[in-house]
Curated annotation (Swiss-Prot):
This is Uncharacterized protein C688.07c. Disulfide bonds: none annotated. Residues 1-100, 144-201, 360-381, 422-441, 454-526, 556-575, 803-864, 940-974, 1005-1024 are annotated as: Disordered. One of its GO terms (molecular function) is cytoskeletal anchor activity. The lineage of its organism: Eukaryota, Fungi, Dikarya, Ascomycota, Taphrinomycotina. The modification Phosphoserine is found at S112, S113, S114, S436, S618, S856. Residues 156-179, 826-859, 1009-1020 have a biased composition (Low complexity). Keywords: Cytoplasm, Phosphoprotein. Residues 1-14, 506-522, 955-974 have a biased composition (Polar residues).
Length: 1038
């Protein structure tokens, strides 16, 4: 077996010796043969042969490209290989090499079965190439494609390199080549590859560059005949008109055999109006080769107009301006400064000859119309290209620039282009337009097109190309522009198009990677039908512009409602991010003032779409100023800030916002002093009461930090999207845990209002959905005070040090509304902010007295609730308390859960979150034991030993504990079953880690002593004693 493999390897065709002494393969790889050596034969012999052709053939029967056998070459290679093998085998005996054959690479064999997984096989480089080719054939067969197909070189879009390489391969096969010839052919092939990668410069505009694409994307693909009448060019917008000009058959190209990437006219019936000059390398200078079948009609507009008239039997007035987009020649950069000088010298001759040719064409225009109508397109193109050939016969190696001369006929028709170009490293190109006083209606479209072509490239400026949005197909755009009739709208938009180019959403959309600007506001009033059409067809920016124009025209609330609640808008296909963007774009219209609505920059810093993370003193002042600016700038038509506070006016102001979500910018733009704030902020009230600890000061822009975050809204804008679904998104419970649902909101003044300066309070229905029953309680939360009022630090300290208690029990009836007993004005809610659990009765009595004198702060409400509670206390008015129905409802509420942690973004928010949780646990535990004991005594399960201190009791005592608690617990872990994390366990962990640290210190000390002193038996024994210092051998071997 070894001898057979050695024979096969010696007979392998592609193996040759490199200069370095190793064996290399001449079998071409898929990207071209990258192995090149001075001793190897020319690459051109096998440059067109792929390894897929060599599969399954005996190497002895393989033929060269000229048909001669390779057997003679293989015999010579065999002798070389045997000589080398004998010399290598002597060395391998001495050095104990593992491979059986000396000069090969060691490849890993693919595992065909389990026992061959680790087996390696000695494979030569040529054999490995054949293995890869076999694998490629197998994959192509599996995919259902032709397994014998050659690999495509995607870098070469033109066939010039393949044709030249095939010619050179034939030449090299016939003539025996020396090493110098090999080098020349190698250099030529490298130059050809380099030319294909060169980015060509053209005298084209960035908008027209989009038209250069393979004809497989054309809409007339594989059309056998040219259509008699072209579709009229509609003026839907400037961008689609450029595309239609490019795809119209006026600029159909004659067939060219050497350009396989662009099909012929007879097959396609259309083409792009640019022809790339095929560059070839014949000598040192790079030249532009003009094919005889190729048509360069940049000098003359007359022949193009005659050509278009012959193609169209019924000539429409819209086709006149199509003549202007003549085919512009591309220039390739010269190699040296000499070529630039020669080109500048020849430039004047070219201009003069071009003028003469254009004059001749002016005289013979009538003849051309009669002749071109009867001849096919290819003959016309050949005749037209003869004029260009006369110019080029003088010096074909020069790089030439074609200059477009405006003919008299075009200027009489009303417009022409003047193109100026100069030779430099960065070509300066200008597109100018000469309008005439009497302009036709069909020209309004081409005017906007021309104005977008008026781009000037400076030497150092960065030119940003117009990029289509990825969501618009060219076919869809073309069909839309064909289906829209221009008609009456053209007369209205004529003056606008002359004054300014129309902003198309594909250019100025958010999807564009380069440009972003809010859309221009559409002028004129929009009907509902037009509005629905635009909502269905156009992009997101069109919708934003439509709604903004509605608001400028003082549209009614119902119209805005139809826009935002349109089912077609909510059912748009798209990813989650696109839905988010749609919703944010519509909901943030109010928050964008008019001063920067049309600016091409991003949203301002004080926009409500930005959330400020973290808080400093400067941030709060900045946000305070920005909020005041917003209130002055934004439209608050629907809510009258200083109007009456009757419920009717409030309902009228809130009606269109019935389906609004948490964090809508309308809720963040209302002034803080207004009485309607509670009604507009009804959605963010519950979340604010839970996460109010994120701001230490009553700054509304900071307290609504989380409610304006896009995490809360989840990007949905349906009508049925209520607050319940928002909170289910924020706290995704897997079990049927209770959620807080806000049902209605109403304004109620305080019942016993004696002083006129008393603030109003908003009463919110809070519905606690338990596992089976729902108990709704009316709760009371005070509104924010204004910014100007300073905080009383003493009150805050008293409130922080006071001990919290749970709310008092109601009357045993089934009334929902809870009234306080004895008119005591404690604002003690479900939790309080701070307070370590005290273990003596005197501390408890003191804390209860403190709670009667000064109200304790609610963890959910902001710090401002304390001062408002004190003002209520002076009034002795009744307040409705906000607390949960059962113990389960409180323990499983979002207040006690960590589910909201994933929604918080920054480290500051998480830090505040954990700090608040610690305060919640300590405050909750401080009054919990007495509350549970009081519940048990009320149910008769515990004997009445002594009357408990005046505390509150729950609404219902459905929760019955299995184990009675008679004394207040010393640690929070004993009182509540849910809190499993104990301080003692934490201390044990820390003590363990500290013990390990001390042990490491002892070990280091022992090591240092060992290194300093001589190693003796006593020092070793001491170090071993150190390891058992803590009574345990912690993983060490003694």
């Amino acid at each position: 077996m070894e001898e057979n493999t050695a024979q096969k390897q010696s007979n392998a065709t592609g193996l040759q010796r490199h200069v370095s002494g190793r064996w290399i393969s001449n079998v071409p790889s898929y990207e071209g043969n990258e192995w090149s050596s001075e001793e190897s034969e020319s690459e051109d012999k096998e440059s067109n042969l792929t390894s897929s052709e060599n599969i399954g053939k005996n190497p002895e029967r393989e033929l060269n490209s000229d048909g001669t056998d390779r057997i003679i070459e293989e015999e010579e290679e065999e002798d070389d290989i045997e000589n080398e093998a004998s010399s290598f085998s002597e060395q391998s005996e001495n050095e104990n090499y593992d491979f059986s054959y000396p000069g090969t690479f060691v490849y890993r064999k693919a595992a065909s079965s389990s026992h061959e997984t680790l087996a390696t096989k000695v494979v030569s480089a040529d054999e490995s190439a054949r293995l890869w080719a076999e694998k490629r054939r197998f994959l192509l067969q599996k995919l259902g494609k032709d397994p014998n197909s050659k690999p495509i070189d995607y870098k070469s879009s033109m066939a010039s390199s393949s044709t030249r390489s095939s010619q050179s391969s034939q030449v090299s096969a016939i003539q025996p080549q020396s090493q110098d010839d090999n080098r020349v052919s190698d250099i030529r092939q490298m130059e050809n590859r380099r030319e294909l990668n060169v980015k060509r410069r053209s005298v084209s505009s960035p908008a027209e560059d989009l038209a250069i694409r393979p004809l497989s994307f054309s809409r007339y693909k594989k059309a056998e005949e040219i259509p008699e009448s072209l579709p009229p060019i509609k003026g839907r917008d400037s961008f689609s008109s450029v595309r239609e000009l490019n795809e119209s058959n006026v600029f159909a190209r004659a067939p060219n055999k050497n350009r396989f990437s662009f099909a012929s006219v007879a097959e396609t019936g259309s083409g792009s109006n640019f022809s790339r000059a095929t560059s070839s390398r014949s000598s040192k200078t790079r030249s532009v080769v003009y094919e005889p079948n190729h048509r360069h009609t940049s000098f003359f507009g007359d022949t193009l107009s005659n050509l278009s008239s012959s193609l169209n039997d019924k000539k429409s007035p819209n086709d006149d301006h199509a003549v202007l987009d003549s085919e512009l020649m591309e220039q390739t950069l010269p190699d040296s400064a000499e070529a630039v000088e020669i080109a500048n010298n020849v430039k004047e001759d070219i201009v003069s000859t071009a003028n003469d040719d254009a004059n001749e064409l002016d005289n013979t225009s009538e003849k051309a119309t009669l002749e071109t109508s009867s001849k096919p397109v290819t003959e016309q193109a050949i005749e037209q290209s003869e004029v260009v050939q006369e110019v080029e016969e003088g010096d074909t190696n020069m790089t030439t620039n074609t200059i477009l001369k405006p003919t008299d006929e075009i200027i009489n028709k009303g417009y022409a282009y003047s193109i100026t170009s100069s030779h430099s490293n960065h070509s300066n190109e200008k597109f100018e337009q000469i309008p005439s006083p009497d302009e036709k209606l069909s020209r309004t479209d081409i005017d906007t097109h021309v104005k977008q072509l008026q781009t000037t490239k400076s030497t150092d400026s960065l030119s940003i190309p117009f990029v289509e949005s990825p969501q618009q197909n060219p076919e869809e755009e073309l069909s839309d522009s064909l289906s829209n009739d221009f008609g009456i709208d053209a007369e209205k938009e004529k003056d606008e198009n002359l004054s300014k180019p129309e902003h198309h959403p594909s250019i100025t959309s958010v999807n564009s990677p380069f440009l972003y600007s809010p859309s221009k506001q559409p002028s004129g009033e929009l009907d509902e039908e037009n509005l629905k059409l635009r909502l269905q067809d156009s992009d997101v920016d069109d919708e934003v512009a439509t709604i903004r124009s509605l608001k400028q025209n003082n549209a009614t609330n119902s119209e805005v409602e139809t826009v935002t609640n349109d089912p077609s808008f909510s059912q748009q296909p798209g990813t989650h991010s696109r839905i988010l963007r749609n919703f944010d774009a519509i909901s943030s219209i109010d928050s964008i003032p008019d001063s920067f609505s049309d600016s091409a920059v991003d949203l301002p810093v004080d926009s409500s779409k930005y959330t400020l993370v973290g808080k400093t003193q400067s941030n709060s002042n900045l946000l305070q100023d920005n909020a005041e600016k917003h209130i002055s700038k934004s439209n608050l038509e629907k809510v009258d800030v200083k109007g009456d506070t009757s419920p009717n006016s409030v309902e009228q102001g809130i009606e269109p916002q019935a389906a609004s979500v948490v964090g809508s910018p309308r809720s963040s733009l209302v002034s803080n002093n207004s009485l309607e704030e509670g009604a507009l902020l009804k959605n963010s009230e519950s979340l604010e009461s839970i996460y109010g600890y994120l701001s230490e000061e009553p700054d509304p822009a900071l307290t609504k930090l989380n409610t304006e975050d896009p995490f809360w809204t989840k990007g949905s804008s349906d009508d049925e999207h209520t607050i319940a679904s928002v909170e289910q998104d924020v706290y995704p419970y897997k079990t049927s845990l209770p959620t807080i649902v806000e049902a209605t909101t109403s304004h109620t003044e305080s019942s016993n209002s004696k002083a006129p300066a008393i603030e109003e309070t908003t009463t919110t229905k809070v519905e606690v959905v338990a596992a089976h029953d729902a108990v709704s309680i009316s709760s009371n939360s005070s509104t924010h005070k204004s910014h100007s009022e300073p905080l009383n630090r003493d009150e805050l300290e008293v409130a922080a040090l006071s001990r919290g208690s749970l709310p008092e029990p109601p009357k045993p009836n089934k009334q929902i509304v809870v009234q306080e007993e004895d008119q005591r004005d404690t604002l003690s809610l479900k939790t309080s902010t701070t307070g370590l659990s005290s273990h003596s009765k005197s501390a408890e009595n003191n804390s209860t007295q403190q709670s009667t004198t000064s109200p304790s702060i609610n963890s959910g409400a902001s710090a401002d609730a304390v001062s408002s509670g004190i003002s209520k206390k002076a009034d002795n008015s009744e307040t409705n308390l906000n607390y949960f129905a059962t113990l389960d409802a409180f323990v499983k509420s979002p207040l006690m859960s960590f589910d909201g942690l994933g929604e918080l973004g920054s480290t500051d928010q998480r830090y505040n979150f954990f700090n608040q949780k610690i305060q919640e646990y300590s405050a909750y535990d401080s009054g919990l034991d007495n509350w549970i004991q009081f519940c048990l005594e009320k149910d008769g399960e515990a004997p009445k030993e002594a009357p408990p201190p005046p505390r509150s009791e729950p609404v219902s005592t459905t929760t019955k504990l299995a184990k009675r608690i008679t004394q207040p617990s010393l640690s929070p872990a004993r009182s509540t079953v849910t809190i499993t994390h104990n301080i003692a366990t934490e201390a044990k962990k820390k003590s363990k880690s500290a013990a390990n640290d001390i042990l490491h210190l002892f070990k280091k000390k022992a090591k240092s002593e060992q290194s300093n002193a001589k190693s003796s038996s006593s020092s070793i024994k001491e170090s071993k004693k150190m390891k058992t210092l803590f009574g345990k051998k912690l993983g060490f071997k003694s």
